[in-house]
Design a protein with these regions (language model features):
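Structural signature of FAD isoalloxazine-binding scaffolds in flavoprotein oxidoreductases
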Residues: 95-107, 167-170, 252, 257-258
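Amphipathic, small/basic residue-rich leader segments at the start of a protein or domain
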Residues: 11-122, 138-149, 153
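A structural signal for short hydrophobic beta-strand segments in well-ordered beta-sheet cores
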Residues: 173-176
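Short Gly/Pro-enriched turn/cap motifs at secondary-structure boundaries
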Residues: 162-166, 193-197, 210-212, 239-247
C-alpha cells in the first residue's frame, strides 16, 4: 500500500524536470533535484512506516526516532542541506532562486516529514530567513548558526486566542520596555514546534507601540523557551492529532523579561 501511494504522488509531481509555466529552471537546479529524488528513494520512503509507528506511539511523544539524526547527517554529506535560503542570503545560501527552490520543495513534500531531514521545514525556515535578513551579528551567532546547523529548533508565536488573528494588527500581547529589558505579557496559541525539547527560542510578535498607527504598533522579539515566566499550558490537537514531535502549543507569557538586544 505504501509503495502504491508513493508512486501515485511521484507521478503527479514533475515540474522541476522542465519548464514551469514558461519559466526555465537552471541545469544546476535540475541536477540538485535529481540527487534529492535519489535521496528520497533511498532514505526517506523506506522510513515512512517507521516514522508513523514511532510518532503514533504515545510513549514517544515529543521525541525523534534514533535514526533521524543519521539521515540529517547524510543530507549534509550529500549537500542537500539548507536548500531553502534564496541567493540573496549569502553566505548561508546555496545560491538558488525562489523559482528553483520551489521545485525542490515539491520533491521534498512527497513525504510529510522529510523537510526536517534537509533542515528546510517551518517554522525554522521562516525564522532563519528573518534572522539572516534582519538579525544582528550577535543574534545570528547565538540563534541563526545553531538553526542552520540543525542543532536546535525554534517556534514562531503570533496567533492569539482572544482576537481574530488572521489580521496581524489585532495582536494584543504586550511588549513594554523597562530599562535594558523588554517585558512580555499575554497569550499565544497554535505555536508550532514549541513543545519539542529541541525548541530553544521563539520569535514572538507583540504590541510594542500602542500609540502608533495601527500598522506600526507591533514588533517581533526573540524569547528563549527557558525564560522565566514563559509557560506551555497545553498541547493542542489539530484534526485530532498532537503532531508530535513538534506540537502546537497554548502558551502564556507572564512578566517574561528579555534583553533589549533581543
Amino acid at each position: 500500500m505504501y509503495k502504491e501511494v508513493l508512486y501515485e504522488v511521484k507521478l503527479k509531481s514533475k515540474c522541476i524536470k522542465g519548464d514551469m509555466m514558461g519559466f526555465e529552471v537552471s541545469d544546476r537546479a535540475k541536477e540538485i533535484n535529481e540527487r534529492l529524488e535519489a535521496f528520497m528513494e533511498e532514505y526517506i520512503y523506506p522510513r515512512e512506516r517507521d516514522y508513523d509507528e514511532f510518532t503514533n506511539d504515545q510513549n514517544n511523544l515529543w521525541q525523534y526516532p534514533d535514526w533521524y539524526e543519521k539521515l540529517k547527517e547524510e543530507a549534509k554529506k550529500q549537500e542537500l542541506w539548507n536548500l531553502f535560503l534564496p541567493k540573496e542570503y549569502a553566505p548561508w545560501s546555496p545560491g538558488l532562486t525562489n523559482l528553483e527552490i520551489a521545485g525542490l520543495f515539491e520533491t521534498m513534500s512527497r513525504s510529510a516529514w522529510s523537510q526536517q531531514i534537509f533542515n528546510c521545514n517551518a517554522p525554522d525556515r521562516g525564522n532563519m530567513e528573518v534572522l539572516a535578513k534582519y538579525g544582528t551579528p550577535e543574534q545570528q551567532k547565538q540563534w541563526l548558526e545553531p538553526l542552520l546547523a540543525g542543532e536546535i529548533r525554534s517556534a514562531y508565536a503570533m496567533t492569539e486566542p482572544d482576537v481574530a488573528s488572521s489580521d496581524a494588527t489585532n495582536m494584543e500581547l504586550e511588549i513594554t520596555r523597562d530599562g535594558d529589558e523588554y517585558v512580555l505579557n499575554g497569550k499565544k496559541w497554535w505555536t508550532t514546534n514549541v513543545i519539542t525539547p529541541k525548541c530553544k527560542f521563539m520569535l514572538v510578535m507583540g504590541k510594542s507601540n500602542p500609540e502608533n498607527p495601527r500598522h506600526t504598533q507591533h514588533s517581533t522579539i526573540i524569547v528563549p523557551t527557558d525564560a522565566e515566566g514563559f509557560t506551555i499550558t497545553r498541547a493542542l490537537r489539530s484534526l485530532g492529532e498532537l503532531h508530535s514531535p513538534g506540537g502546537e502549543g497554548d502558551v502564556v507569557f507572564k512578566n517574561v523579561r528579555v534583553p533589549v538586544s533581543n
